[in-house]
Amino acid sequence: MMLLKTTLIIALGGALGSVARFMLSKLISESSTTSFPLSTLVVNVLGCLIIGFVYALFDNKENASVALKQFLAIGFCGGFTTFSTFSNESFNLYQLQHFTQLALYITASVVLGFFAI
């Protein structure tokens, strides 16, 4: 039952994050006169700010709501942008001083993602 509750919480956050991404991207794209993908850049950076705020808010808090953290970090940010997760994982590798893994992860993600497209 707990897995179902967690899954539904994350799904709701993901749905809201996806809609927020669509609306913000549409708003920015309609007001932009350049071919530069400004809306994607804004969404990705904003997603990083949100996930950073969530982890800072809930870090080392014993009474923090696990459900709210999952809703925001995994659900909303996951639906809003996967770039925030990539950046958070990269930052974690940096904090752990796993610099070789960090360089490999960033390089592989960008290069493999580029060629996969």
Describe each region flagged by the PLM.
Residues 1-117:
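Membrane-interface helix-loop junctions in multi-pass transporters/channels
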